[in-house]
């Protein structure tokens, strides 16, 4: 597994497709059996429509702030969304840095 020592440096950031222009992500873990963990860097003026996922999603705001559902989520805020739960819309006026964790996909037989 690739190890990243400095999460805040400018290395290993990539354009986050499917998000507002200027959104960047740094993949910390991407494992089919263990899920995915990323740092998501929201630019000023970020916005995203409501959506859902087939796995649970967790947010921990490290820097900045975002708004969703009429509430503000500043640094230190945590949210968890269940599998299939619609969440959003999201916006960030000044940008934010968020730790995002998705649970692994589980196949039900």
Please identify what each model-predicted range represents.
Residues 83-108:
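Ligand-binding loop in jelly-roll beta-barrel domains
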Residues 32-35, 43-57, 73:
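A short beta-loop-beta micro-motif enriched in histidine and acidic residues
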Residues 25-27, 37-39, 58, 78-80:
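Conserved hydrophobic/aromatic beta-strand scaffold that supports enzyme active sites
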Residues 1-34:
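A short, N-terminal "cap"/entry segment at the start of jelly-roll beta-barrel domains
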Residues 68-88:
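Short acidic-glycine-tyrosine-enriched beta hairpin
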Residues 53-68, 75:
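Glycine- and acidic-residue-biased ligand/ion/polar-headgroup-sensing regions
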């Amino acid at each position: 597994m690739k190890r990243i020592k400095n999460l805040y440096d400018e290395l290993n950031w990539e354009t986050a497709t499917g998000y507002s222009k200027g959104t960047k992500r740094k993949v910390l873990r991407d494992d089919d059996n263990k899920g995915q963990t990323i740092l998501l860097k929201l630019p000023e003026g970020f916005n995203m429509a409501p959506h859902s996922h087939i796995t649970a999603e967790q947010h921990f705001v490290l820097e900045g702030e975002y708004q969703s559902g009429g509430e503000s989520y500043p640094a230190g805020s945590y949210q968890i969304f269940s599998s299939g739960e619609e969440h959003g819309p999201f916006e960030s006026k000044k940008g934010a840095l968020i730790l995002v964790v998705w649970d692994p996909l589980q196949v039900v037989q």
